[in-house]
Amino acid sequence: MSPQTETKASVGFKAGVKDYKLTYYTPDYETKDTDILAAFRVTPQPGVPPEEAGAAVAAESSTGTWTTVWTDGLTSLDRYKGRCYHIEPVAGEENQYIAYVAYPLDLFEEGSVTNMFTSIVGNVFGFKALRALRLEDLRIPPAYSKTFQGPPHGIQVERDKLNKYGRPLLGCTIKPKLGLSAKNYGRAVYECLRGGLDFTKDDENVNSQPFMRWRDRFLFCAEAIYKAQAETGEIKGHYLNATAGTCEEMIKRAVFARELGVPIVMHDYLTGGFTANTSLAHYCRDNGLLLHIHRAMHAVIDRQKNHGIHFRVLAKALRMSGGDHIHAGTVVGKLEGEREITLGFVDLLRDDFIEKDRSRGIYFTQDWVSLPGVLPVASGGIHVWHMPALTEIFGDDSVLQFGGGTLGHPWGNAPGAVANRVALEACVQARNEGRDLAREGNEIIREACKWSPELAAACEVWKEIKFEFEAMDTL
């Protein structure tokens, strides 16, 4: 390179490393309506100031790299860079801060959750200046959410398809989750649906194993659905898990489900990936299929309080990517779910407009505009004694899913389903009459036992079962 060229190239450019906060910490910045906003829980390494840590997150998740590069002069960093615009300490925690970062909308591909996460959480979590990092919340502006189809159908369309109103929907995961033949699996599906459930479900790891290939399972489950519908006069469904090793195979399974005329399929959206999930959601809308979403692997990402991604972010991402149901914890069962936090992201799934509410872990006001809502699914260690609490906590727009709480009934699968349906109907009737489910729940269930021997037997079996552990994820 000639001296003249060197001079031209170096005008306005100084090589070397400089503090991130000089460029990416901008406390005077006023956020725009079109910005994607993020709240990160930051734990800096000893000796790293919180402003530098927050700026590093903004830089490494947007335009920055570890050193100054001369190609910065070929673009407008002020237009494209992420900005850490506010930092606050976390109450009760030592050396933890909430860093608020604003990202310009032009950094993200339209309609792509994959691209959004690749930018915001793709690389920065391994950054050495940080001891730990957790994405607590995202504000998705309408300008971005409108580029997504979202759920294939949404809550109201699902109710219209099923012709079921005024109560939560009832489901059951077929157990044992692995090992049944397709014919025996279909038998269990029929018995549960015939007993009064609305849905049965493939477990998340039921795909196409040697003991039960997917096509055989789909056929026997479809037979069970049609037989139960004919005998009950109600529309029934089974979540046929279309999750597969390739997107092509996944769509092939969904196509076969549509050809069978069943109402709903299922996908494991985290293990399957957002690209696959969005593709399946588009297929489901185009072909009239409901889409049930399982969150297998979520606790690997969201359970640690100071590192990872909070489930409220994964829930928002699912609403954008597409799904009509998603598992959302129970508050009362065997799986993690602190009440106020759970209700916070349940509202983020169902409602059109959600106000900022730090008491429920909601860091930003979220306006979904016209994006359809998602039904939260309560599943995991629940039984008939939990029915009043579940009905009170989740309300009508939910799916209450009892696996062992149906199939573990001492008289069999169908009586287990009867017990759950009777308990639910009793709780809904009591609520509609103005009774307090939280205070009178046990009494309501005992009253219903008098005219349902199936419910009485279930209550006797599970009267002592409790899952009482301290929640990991608290405010």
UniProtKB/Swiss-Prot annotation:
Intracellular or extracellular location(s): Plastid, Chloroplast
Residues modified as N6-carboxylysine: K201
EC number, as in UniProt: 4.1.1.39
Binding site for Mg(2+): K201, D203, E204
Active site, per annotation: K175, H294
Family matches, as PROSITE patterns: RUBISCO_LARGE
Modified residues (N6,N6,N6-trimethyllysine): K14
Function: RuBisCO catalyzes two reactions: the carboxylation of D-ribulose 1,5-bisphosphate, the primary event in carbon dioxide fixation, as well as the oxidative fragmentation of the pentose substrate in the photorespiration process. Both reactions occur simultaneously and in competition at the same active site.
Subunit structure: Heterohexadecamer of 8 large chains and 8 small chains; disulfide-linked. The disulfide link is formed within the large subunit homodimers.
Note: The basic functional RuBisCO is composed of a large chain homodimer in a 'head-to-tail' conformation. In form I RuBisCO this homodimer is arranged in a barrel-like tetramer with the small subunits forming a tetrameric 'cap' on each end of the 'barrel'.
HAMAP family documented for this protein: RuBisCO_L_type1
The protein's name: Ribulose bisphosphate carboxylase large chain
Species lineage: Eukaryota, Viridiplantae, Streptophyta, Embryophyta, Tracheophyta
